[in-house]
Regions:
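Short, conserved beta-strand element in jelly-roll/cupin
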Residues: 38-42, 53-71, 109-113
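A short beta-loop-beta micro-motif enriched in histidine and acidic residues
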Residues: 26-34, 45-58, 74
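Ligand-binding loop in jelly-roll beta-barrel domains
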Residues: 30, 88-115
Length: 158
């Protein structure tokens, strides 16, 4: 049985500045339409790039540490026990950074099982993701690479 205080981290993320670990607690518990993840972010690292979602609202709980939260309103420090909601769309944009000396632990809850589109404003990317139980599609593009709806399409023979 999964435990948020002793999680089995099943998704390491290793990229300079974004090293962290994720335990997909919801999936480990057998949830199909509800996601819950414990994130552990070492000092000097970010959990993920600044982004917002089009389909998934998120609810974040700080379990340990004092992460810095970036939103459209700016930066602020969170404390253990704080809860923050990130609605869909630009107003829900967020990023968590550990500027402290101890590891940060977060619990994030969101819907699962729906395709998701994420926008990364700092890098001008858009991500398209399938979610469990389907999974498979995970692609990122520069927003400037957009093409016309009909590009490459030929009308059917009549």
């Amino acid at each position: 049985m999964p435990n948020i205080f002793e999680p089995h981290f099943d998704e390491p993320r290793e990229h300079p500045g974004f090293d962290c670990r994720r335990a997909r607690i919801g999936r480990q518990a057998g949830a199909e339409r509800l996601g819950a993840s414990v994130w552990e972010v070492p000092p000097g690292q970010a959990a993920y790039p600044y982004h917002f979602h089009y389909a998934e609202e998120e609810l974040l709980f700080v379990l340990a540490g004092r992460p810095s939260l970036r939103t459209p309103e700016g930066w602020r420090e969170l404390a253990p026990g704080d809860a923050v909601a990130f609605p869909v769309g630009e107003r829900g944009a967020h990023q968590l950074v550990n500027r402290g000396e101890d590891a940060v632990r977060l619990l994030v809850v969101s819907p699962a099982g729906v395709p998701e589109i994420c926008v990364y404003p700092d890098s001008g990317k858009v991500g398209i993701y399938d979610r469990a139980p389907i999974e498979g599609l995970r692609e990122l593009y520069r927003r400037g690479d957009a093409v016309d709806y009909y590009e490459g399409e030929e009308p059917p023979a009549v």
